[in-house]
Amino acid sequence: MALLMEHQFRQLPADKQVETRPFLEAVSHLPPFFDCLGSAVFSPIKADIAGNITKIKAVYDSNPTRFKTLQQILEAEKEMHGAEWPKVGATLALMWLKRGLRFIQVLLQSLVDGDKDDNNPNLIKVNVTKAYEMALKKYHGWIVQKLFQAALYAAPYRSDFLRALSKGREVKDEECLDKVRQFLVNFTATNDAIYEMYTKMNADLDYKV
């Protein structure tokens, strides 16, 4: 699990405020996760995540003191953009980023939970399907949904996927999954806090692409 464990997310403080700089540092290492899935069809999610990180970073870099937390960014943009908010700026970028992170979160949690197709236990199609349906499907139009259905048939074997997460090293599946569990603790808490923030601030949008 070296790919993810080398760049852990921070434990959240009691008030669940997500600090912008360490968050951006941690998420910047996540796009290569999609290379582990093997299919180029997943590259749009990878590109979307990378692009949204860049947009959020640009806003943060413009005033690191003012934008110390993600909530401070949303609050400032709400005041700045008025009726255009939340359809603009880092607020919109983070909205889509959290969905990409939820895809990763659900996929990894599904593997840890042992979800599998009893007829094909070494395929991760079940896990990828669950992640897509829970995180992204409702925001995709018919054409994009069909593209991802095609990608499912190119999903790698479970053993190959875990090996890719371990950067090609031969490690036991259970050893890799133990590290996935460790990674998920702060990663899940962080993304859940972002979802909660969007709900409280009424900043989520449900349009399709």
UniProtKB/Swiss-Prot annotation:
Chain positions of Sequence repeats: 45-55, 56-66
Gene Ontology, cellular component aspect: cytosol
Molecular functions per Gene Ontology: ceramide 1-phosphate binding; ceramide 1-phosphate transfer activity
Localization, UniProt: Cytoplasm
UniProt keyword annotation of Membrane present: no
Family matches, as InterPro entries: GLTP_sf, Glycolipid_transfer_prot_dom
One Pfam family from the record: GLTP
Highest taxon listed in the record's lineage: Eukaryota
GO biological process: ceramide transport; intermembrane lipid transfer
Coiled-coil segments: none
Major place of residence: cytoplasm
Residues binding beta-D-galactosyl-(1->4)-beta-D-glucosyl-(1<->1)-N-[(9Z)-octadecenoyl]-sphing-4-enine, per UniProt: 48-55, 140, 207
This protein's record includes keyword Repeat: yes
Alphabetized UniProt keyword annotations: Cytoplasm, Lipid transport, Repeat, Transport
Region feature (2 X 12 AA approximate tandem repeats): 45-66
Classification via PANTHER family: GLYCOLIPID TRANSFER PROTEIN (PTHR10219:SF97), GLYCOLIPID TRANSFER PROTEIN-RELATED (PTHR10219)
Family stated for the protein in its record: Belongs to the GLTP family.
Biological function: Accelerates the intermembrane transfer of various glycolipids. Catalyzes the transfer of various glycosphingolipids between membranes but does not catalyze the transfer of phospholipids. May be involved in the intracellular translocation of glucosylceramides.
Identification of the protein by name: Glycolipid transfer protein
Species this chain originates from: Danio rerio (Zebrafish)
